[in-house]
């Protein structure tokens, strides 16, 4: 008598191991991009896993029962996903109500969008790019869950139809899924534009209008449900064609070696992808550019590599996959991967406050342990009790106690009353605060807005006709530098060119005698345009101060072009950059520090080293200046050029 074969994949420890690989990659990437620049691709692995598992469940149910119960499927998904997410949203709202009240107004739309499974489209619509580094965005990571939740809503409907009208033609449906994934890859490649997708300091290239708002092309491609569904379709195709648990048990032999090879090929493909697709976008002096290969088949390639890893993980003869991915550590992480994904990003954000700030190894270990503790609490006391129906049992027992007239002890009544009070008061406070909060700028944005206004006023005052007065000699590095007058307008004796860092000290620099030209998101190349113009109208004076490189990675050629224009300027002072963005900081500072050896009139002020010693002068993004830091920064520059 033959043994009945299971109709559905049972528990697969190695598949949990695949989840673990994906979530660890994402967590490391979110902690510090320089550690694993392609770690964001872990999300694509999750998409393939979801497409595979959900389609497998739906096909198995159809074969077992002759139909698919849409209601039961959606209830199971809701019990699996919603409780932990609701706890997260409530927890973030309560934390911000107590400690980050200025951010509540900005958070309100994010929470509403997350509740209705539309966070990715909300993020596209409001134009808060996924790639901004200086925003407080504790829920930004929910975009990928929104993509999956939309899939969970629509996919059962499609599978219900497919299993009804084409039950005997599932292979054809599987081929259709593959063709659809290829079509998505082609559409993404055709929609993507190579080169600069946004000029530094300007609005990203608009792709289309969505409900009256401009949509940036790169946000649409990276965050959109349609363009990111390719992995889901590949996973669904795998579920149609690959159900090894239906096969008769066979010896490992050569078949095991074959699937070990498939596993290694897939794992190698993911490793190569993480190395090649180093980020989604990069900002250089040309502008913000995307990684062409990523949008021209890169996501599809990652999906194929994920298919290979998953196919091996669920096959009983793939011993290598089971050993590497099915051990206790990997399965522990994999079973909690949903909670880890949910909680790690808010923990990181509530600590560092700004998305682009990299964590140190010490901070990373502590914050991951905190996220893991929250995940474990959620797993034990929220996710599993809801999934197993324990909350319903508890509630029925409480009702039975009341119906039977059971007398509780005073201590028990007090304990329950205290828990009830906390469970009601804090959430109510958070919800009321959230509903009534105003949308505000964060501290950095507010400071920069005030500085921009000050710069406009200062430039208007400086551009007014005045009598040209020759300055007194000043001593710099042992030499004498004397400013001279021009016939074409007022000489700019000390010209300071910078980005948002210098913008934070614009008023202080002006009060100390400098003419300031600073703006947010400025690239190093834009300094060339400024000095070329001022030289053409003969307004360049004795000293030019340049502090750029926070927003873009520059090149030696750009600095050389600037110095060709400034070769006759007696003193050019460059400041190194201090920004939590690697390798940009290292590359730019290496180029800046090399300038004095090439140009005798160049001096370097090592702002990176100084700022590292005085973190109290910087906002929590470790880049922009607090008011006291603005004064300190201006004094440093004046000391460096001999004016203080």
Model-derived features: where do they sit?
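A short, compositionally biased domain-edge/stem linker segment
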Residues: 1-11, 476-485
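Short, conserved loop/helix-junction motifs that constitute active-site signature segments
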Residues: 537-539, 563-569
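Extracellular/periplasmic envelope-modification machinery, especially enzymes
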Residues: 192-195, 206-208, 237, 276-280, ...
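Short hydrophobic segments within beta-strands
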Residues: 48, 497-498, 547, 575
């Amino acid at each position: 008598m033959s043994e009945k074969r299971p109709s559905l994949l049972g528990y697969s420890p190695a598949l949990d191991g695949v989840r673990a690989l994906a979530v660890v990659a994402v967590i490391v990437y979110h902690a510090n991009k320089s550690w694993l620049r392609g770690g964001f691709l872990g999300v694509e692995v999750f998409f393939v896993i979801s497409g595979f598992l959900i389609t497998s469940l739906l096909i198995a149910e159809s074969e077992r029962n002759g139909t698919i119960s849409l209601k039961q499927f959606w209830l199971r998904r809701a019990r699996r996903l919603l409780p932990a997410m609701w706890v997260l949203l409530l927890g973030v709202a309560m934390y911000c109500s107590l400690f980050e009240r200025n951010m509540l107004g900005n958070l309100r739309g994010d929470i509403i969008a997350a509740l209705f499974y539309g966070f990715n489209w909300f993020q596209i619509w409001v134009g808060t790019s996924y790639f901004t580094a200086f925003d407080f965005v504790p829920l930004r990571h929910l975009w990928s869950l929104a993509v999956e939740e939309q899939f969970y809503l629509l996919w059962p409907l499609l599978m219900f139809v497919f299993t009804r009208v084409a039950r005997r033609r599932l292979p054809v449906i599987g081929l259709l899924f593959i063709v659809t994934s290829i079509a998505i890859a082609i559409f993404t490649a055709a929609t993507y534009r190579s080169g600069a997708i946004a000029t530094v300091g300007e609005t990203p290239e608009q792709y289309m209008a969505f409900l009256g708002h401009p949509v940036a092309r790169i946000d649409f491609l990276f965050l959109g449900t349609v363009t990111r569904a390719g992995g889901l379709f590949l996973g669904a195709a795998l579920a149609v064609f690959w159900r090894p648990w239906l096969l008769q048990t066979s010896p490992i032999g050569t078949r095991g070696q074959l699937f070990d090879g498939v596993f290694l090929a897939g794992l190698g493909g993911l490793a190569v992808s993480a190395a090649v697709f180093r980020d989604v976008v990069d900002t250089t002096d040309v502008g913000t550019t995307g990684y062409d290969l990523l949008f021209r088949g890169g996501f599809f390639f990652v999906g194929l590599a994920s298919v290979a890893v998953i196919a091996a993980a669920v096959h009983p003869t793939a011993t290598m996959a089971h050993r590497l991915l099915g051990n206790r550590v990997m399965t522990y992480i994999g079973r909690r991967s949903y909670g880890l994904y949910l909680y790690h990003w808010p923990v990181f954000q509530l600590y560092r406050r700004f998305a682009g700030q990299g964590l140190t190894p010490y901070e990373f270990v502590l914050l991951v342990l905190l996220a893991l503790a929250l995940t474990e609490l959620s797993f034990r006391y929220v996710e599993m009790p809801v999934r197993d129906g324990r909350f319903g049992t508890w509630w029925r027992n409480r009702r039975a106690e009341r119906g039977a007239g059971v007398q509780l002890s005073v201590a028990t009544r007090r304990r329950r009353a205290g828990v009830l009070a906390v469970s009601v008061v804090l959430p109510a406070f958070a919800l009321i605060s959230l509903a009534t909060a105003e949308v505000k700028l964060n501290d950095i944005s507010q400071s920069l807005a005030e500085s921009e206004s000050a710069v406009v006023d200062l430039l208007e005052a400086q551009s007014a006709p005045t009598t040209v007065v020759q300055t007194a000699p000043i001593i710099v590095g042992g030499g004498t530098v004397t400013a001279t007058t021009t016939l074409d307008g007022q000489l700019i004796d000390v010209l300071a060119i910078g980005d948002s860092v210098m913008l934070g000290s614009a008023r202080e620099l002006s009060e100390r005698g400098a003419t300031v030209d600073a703006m947010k998101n400025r690239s190093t190349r834009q300094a060339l345009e400024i000095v070329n113009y001022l030289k053409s109208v003969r307004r360049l004076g004795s000293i030019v101060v340049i502090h750029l490189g926070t927003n873009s990675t520059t090149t030696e050629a750009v600095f050389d072009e600037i110095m060709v224009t400034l070769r006759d300027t007696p003193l050019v002072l460059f400041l190194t950059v201090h920004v939590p963005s690697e390798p940009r900081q290292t590359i730019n500072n290496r180029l800046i520090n090399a300038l004095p050896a090439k140009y005798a009139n160049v001096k370097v002020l090592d702002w990176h080293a100084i700022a590292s010693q005085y973190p109290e002068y910087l906002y929590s993004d470790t880049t922009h200046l607090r008011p006291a830091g603005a004064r300190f920064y201006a004094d440093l520059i004046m000391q460096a050029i001999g004016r203080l």
